[in-house]
Amino acid sequence: RCETCDSLTTPQPTDNKFRVVTNKFWDNWFVLADVGGHVFLGDYGSVGKFSGLLSPELNIGVGKWFTPGIGVKLQFGISNSRGYSKEPTYYTYGGQKTADDGTPYWKSKMKWWDLSASAMFNLSRLFCGYEGKDSDKLMNQFIASVGIGALHHWGIDEQRNEWSGHLELQYSRFLSRKKNFSLDLKARATLYQTNF
């Protein structure tokens, strides 16, 4: 007879909203798609008009939340970054222009696509705890991401490949208690060496 078998250990329910619970592999996957615009901040951004730095951007991706506060995402983005250069390069087009202070410059456009992987941190859940399933709490959430990617310039005679760094702060407004659909506002920085 096993005397230690007489007392069984059973899991106890807890209301601790800060406990870490991982999920099964197929749970908590998501897809993302966003369109927006960005401003290219290069070395010569001040020689021309600000409107000449604005460009559209498209991103699609897939990700997974491992815990309510920590996840990863794989993302593909494509855009062109418009800016200015004080010398002709692979990225410049058109004729020479002159700034108000007499500085000569050229308009530039860098076409690129980027594949990146990022770690995501749901700041709302990390600081306030998990709100529970189908809850009307935390309908507004803030998510920070940091990652690394591979960026490819295209449409120039010499193709360029380089590493990229990614920083992002996202505000999500969920539209249902299930939190399966949201409208997001993102501030994102993609950092890369332009080599011109």
Language-model regions, residue ranges each:
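Extended serine/threonine-enriched, polar tracts that run as long, contiguous segments within proteins
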Residues: 164-196
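Gram-negative (and chloroplast) outer-membrane scaffold detector with strong preference
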Residues: 68-165, 175-179
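Short glycine/proline- and aromatic-enriched beta-strand/turn motifs that initiate or cap beta-hairpins
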Residues: 1-63
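Solvent-exposed loop/turn segments connecting transmembrane beta-strands
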Residues: 47-53, 154-164, 196
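Hydrophobic, lipid-facing positions within transmembrane beta-strands of outer-membrane proteins
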Residues: 29-31, 56-60, 113-117, 163-169
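Membrane-spanning beta-strand positions in outer-membrane beta-barrel proteins
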Residues: 30, 71, 143, 170, ...
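Transmembrane beta-strand segments that form the barrel wall of outer-membrane beta-barrel proteins
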Residues: 31-43, 78-79, 141-154, 187-193
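Transmembrane beta-barrel domains of outer membrane proteins
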Residues: 22, 54, 61-63, 120-124, ...
